[in-house]
């Protein structure tokens, strides 16, 4: 409630024309002042709202690795999305079972707050995922696998700024998978997708191949990020034509490990010793990823930021 001034009009003026005029003038001056304050408040908040609406925040999360990685995703993902005002989230889940992913693990990642799951070279390690790949449009396998294999390599998803495409490709340097050239596959999927923002998870080993892909798609994709190597790189950037990029997101998995594996097992492997099946150590985990801020009008990336969350 707005209280007008309670000052009494001098007695000499209370019953004459001047007194009435003075009261009216006092009322209208306060009304105008309150109205101007209200207009200023509305303009300020409308401007801020428009600024917020012009930004679209995408969270990309690195390879979920083992049971510890799954726990970390379930523990931290929603809070991280809230902290960065994330409207859309893509998580690479190809190592959720250590190597590969099961339908139950995919459901757990989606329930934890992921909008889409991407995969990589371990897609087929758990054959029970094949039917799930056919049935769910919220999990993608690399688009440059053979077309006859189960699943899809890209999808279009509705967001608050309209449709956004997510694509998954796999590299060929030091990889035994991906029969189609990923650069040719990128051209094809961009043509099929049409004129909407495209987010690409490029699951590749070589830094040079990832960088080349990013520059190849600069101005054509909203963001390109690398996965697979499990080590977060410090080169997040926005390329000259407006594509957000980072060479590798890192992983979601054990902090004290070699790419998620017990250190002693990895050391034995490099020493040429006999090794047992890889195991994932207990202990604290780290969630790694990046947030890409897109301009909702142009679909271009305006900023890229690394994120990490420790248990």
Residue locations for each model-derived region?
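Short, low-complexity segments with poor structural confidence in diverse proteins
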Residues: 1-2, 12, 31, 41
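Serine residues within intrinsically disordered or low-complexity segments
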Residues: 5-6, 26-29
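Short linear/disordered segments characteristic of secreted peptide precursors
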Residues: 8-9, 44
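Short, positively charged and aromatic/hydrophobic N-terminal segments
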Residues: 21, 30-35, 39-44, 48-50
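Acidic, metal/ion-coordinating pockets
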Residues: 45-311
């Amino acid at each position: 409630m707005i209280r007008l001034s309670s000052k009494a009009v001098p007695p000499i003026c209370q019953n004459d024309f001047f007194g009435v005029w003075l009261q009216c003038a006092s009322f209208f001056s306060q009304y105008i002042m309150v109205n101007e304050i209200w207009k200023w408040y509305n303009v300020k908040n409308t401007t801020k709202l428009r600024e917020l609406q012009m930004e679209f925040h995408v969270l990309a999360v690195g390879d979920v690795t083992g049971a510890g990685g799954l726990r970390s995703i379930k523990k931290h993902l929603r809070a991280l999305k809230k902290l960065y005002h994330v409207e859309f989230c893509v998580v690479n889940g190809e190592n959720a079972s250590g190597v590969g992913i099961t339908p139950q693990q995919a459901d757990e990642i989606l329930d934890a707050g992921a909008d889409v799951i991407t995969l990589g070279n371990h897609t087929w390690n758990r054959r029970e995922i094949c039917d799930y790949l056919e049935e769910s449009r919220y999990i993608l396998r690399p688009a440059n696998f053979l077309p006859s294999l189960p699943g899809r390599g890209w999808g279009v998803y509705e967001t608050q700024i309209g449709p956004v495409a997510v694509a998954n490709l796999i590299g060929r340097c030091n990889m035994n998978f991906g029969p189609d050239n990923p650069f040719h596959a990128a051209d094809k999927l961009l043509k099929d997708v049409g004129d909407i923002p495209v987010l690409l998870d490029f699951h590749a080993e070589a830094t040079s191949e990832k960088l080349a892909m990013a520059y190849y798609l600069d101005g054509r994709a909203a963001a390109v990020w690398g996965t697979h190597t499990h080590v977060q790189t410090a080169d997040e950037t926005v390329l000259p034509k407006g594509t957000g990029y980072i060479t590798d997101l890192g992983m979601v998995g054990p902090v004290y490990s070699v790419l998620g594996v017990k250190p002693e097992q990895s050391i034995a492997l490099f020493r040429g010793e006999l090794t047992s099946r890889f195991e994932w150590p207990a202990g604290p985990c780290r969630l790694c990823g990046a947030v890409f801020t897109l301009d909702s009008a142009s679909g271009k990336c305006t900023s890229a930021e690394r994120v990490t969350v420790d248990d």
